């Protein structure tokens, strides 16, 4: 299968199954290897591509118009220099137009270049999305050459030989290497980002590729936030006298990251420190208590996913970005399922009944997406405040 646009293509996408899509290259030049997935969000494309959880992936947007609001520094989701290694490629249907937003401080194409993201436009994204939906995510090679000099056969061979996401540890590539305090709070129009509190519960975030908005919302909820590399030890954590710990989002196979992360996470649980896990953090908390994770065929990537909250009985519309999932049937007796995806019934959250531990698979910080789950941060920090004051 080969999909060809006109005029002369300057970019190409080759899938591991031999399929080829020809398009117009933009963003960074060169070749990138990654797992191709589709994202259904209509807005927030800068935040999506800057999410460290997308490290090693090529994002196909189902919404045709991408980047027409440009990019700006305030919407940055990389919480550290290392976290700028996020998505490696982007695929869109329509040509990227000049920015139409007063908030833009650069064009989207320029931003793609600065982030090293190889991008294609003019692709039949509906056909590509159907292929992923029916056959599952697969590895790919994406190329951009301004002169159109692309060796298609070599590109197909590169895609076929690319290592899959299963068994890959990517969190260490996007996690910070040094710890530090985080003081940036919530954003408001005309005011920018607020400054965090000088007192309040101390929250230590283990960084496996944490999104900046997770840190902002923790700060906005009243926590004093410190961030440590994901490879930090329990002694490193205890040295900061935390009232709570957050195990962050991040990319890759949780079982592989867990090889170095689980001993520390288990030690946090053994110390009875209140803990919140998000996305990859949710998966690794599940592994720490004896549950299992598995690769998903298509994954969940978008800003319109319905999740049932069993504790409130309400349906929350949330942002999701994950290619692995917790097998809810393997959760131990002391773990109660709190959230479930209404798309496929997969686990989207649990809590422990004998320890102060909560975990959600979706992204409660959104950015982009609905704000239905912002309360996750308020409840967690509120729980810590109650314990501190008790």
Curated annotation (Swiss-Prot):
Pathway: Amino-acid biosynthesis; L-arginine biosynthesis; carbamoyl phosphate from bicarbonate: step 1/1; Pyrimidine metabolism; UMP biosynthesis via de novo pathway; (S)-dihydroorotate from bicarbonate: step 1/3. It comes from the Bacteria. Pfam families: CPSase_sm_chain (PF00988), GATase (PF00117). Gene3D superfamilies: 3.40.50.880, Carbamoyl-phosphate synthase small subunit, N-terminal domain. Its EC number is 6.3.5.5. Residues 202-390 form the Glutamine amidotransferase type-1 domain. The active site is at 279 (nucleophile), 363, 365. Residues 1-198 are annotated as: CPSase. CDD domains: GATase1_CPSase (cd01744). Coiled coil: none annotated. GO terms for biological process: 'de novo' pyrimidine nucleobase biosynthetic process; 'de novo' UMP biosynthetic process; glutamine metabolic process; L-arginine biosynthetic process. It catalyses: hydrogencarbonate + L-glutamine + 2 ATP + H2O = carbamoyl phosphate + L-glutamate + 2 ADP + phosphate + 2 H(+). L-glutamine binds at residues 53, 250, 252, 280, 283, 321, 323-324. GO terms for molecular function: ATP binding; carbamoyl-phosphate synthase (glutamine-hydrolyzing) activity; glutaminase activity. Keywords: Amino-acid biosynthesis, Arginine biosynthesis, ATP-binding, Glutamine amidotransferase, Ligase, Nucleotide-binding, Pyrimidine biosynthesis. PROSITE patterns: GATASE_TYPE_1. InterPro entries: Anth_synth/Amidotransfase, CarbamoylP_synth_ssu, CarbamoylP_synth_ssu_N, CarbP_synth_ssu_N_sf, Class_I_gatase-like, CPSase_GATase1, GATASE. Composed of two chains; the small (or glutamine) chain promotes the hydrolysis of glutamine to ammonia, which is used by the large (or ammonia) chain to synthesize carbamoyl phosphate. Tetramer of heterodimers (alpha,beta)4. Belongs to the CarA family. Small subunit of the glutamine-dependent carbamoyl phosphate synthetase (CPSase). CPSase catalyzes the formation of carbamoyl phosphate from the ammonia moiety of glutamine, carbonate, and phosphate donated by ATP, constituting the first step of 2 biosynthetic pathways, one leading to arginine and/or urea and the other to pyrimidine nucleotides. The small subunit (glutamine amidotransferase) binds and cleaves glutamine to supply the large subunit with the substrate ammonia. This is Carbamoyl phosphate synthase small chain.
């Amino acid at each position: 299968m080969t999909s060809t646009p006109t005029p002369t293509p300057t970019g190409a996408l080759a899938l591991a199954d031999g399929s080829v899509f020809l398009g117009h290259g933009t963003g960074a030049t060169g070749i990138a290897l990654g797992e191709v997935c589709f994202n259904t969000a209509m807005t927030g494309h800068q935040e999506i591509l800057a999410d460290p959880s997308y490290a090693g992936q090529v994002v196909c947007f189902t919404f045709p118009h991408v980047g027409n609001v440009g990019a700006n520094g305030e919407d940055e989701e990389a919480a550290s220099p290392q976290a700028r290694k996020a998505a490696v490629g982007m695929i869109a249907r329509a040509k990227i137009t000049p920015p139409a937003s007063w908030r833009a401080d650069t064009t989207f194409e320029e931003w793609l270049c600065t982030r090293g993201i190889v991008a294609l436009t003019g692709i039949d994204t509906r056909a590509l999305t159907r292929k992923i939906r029916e056959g599952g995510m697969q590895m790919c090679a994406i190329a951009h050459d301004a002169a159109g000099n692309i060796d298609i056969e070599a590109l197909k061979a590169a895609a076929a030989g690319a290592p899959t996401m299963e068994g890959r540890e990517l969190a260490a590539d996007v996690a910070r290497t040094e710890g530090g305090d985080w003081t940036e709070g919530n954003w408001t129009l005309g005011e920018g980002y607020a400054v965090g509190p000088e007192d309040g519960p101390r929250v230590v975030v283990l960084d496996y590729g944490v999104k900046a908005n997770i840190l902002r919302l923790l700060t906005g909820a009243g926590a004093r936030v410190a961030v440590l590399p994901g490879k930090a030890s329990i002694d490193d954590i205890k040295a900061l006298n935390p009232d709570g710990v957050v195990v962050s989002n991040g990319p890759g196979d949780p079982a592989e990251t867990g090889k170095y992360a689980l001993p520390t996470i288990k030690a946090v649980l053994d110390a009875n420190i209140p803990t919140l896990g998000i996305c990859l953090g949710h998966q690794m908390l599940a592994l720490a208590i004896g549950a299992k994770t598995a690769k998903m065929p298509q994954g969940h990537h978008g800003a319109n996913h319905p999740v049932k909250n069993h504790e409130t009985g309400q349906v929350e519309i949330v942002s999701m970005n994950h290619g692995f999932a917790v097998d809810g049937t393997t959760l131990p007796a002391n773990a109660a399922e709190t959230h479930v995806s209404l798309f496929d019934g997969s686990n989207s959250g649990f809590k422990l009944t004998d320890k102060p531990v909560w975990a959600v698979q979706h992204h409660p910080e959104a950015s982009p997406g609905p704000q239905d789950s912002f309360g996750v941060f308020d409840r967690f920090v509120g729980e810590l405040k109650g314990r501190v004051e008790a």
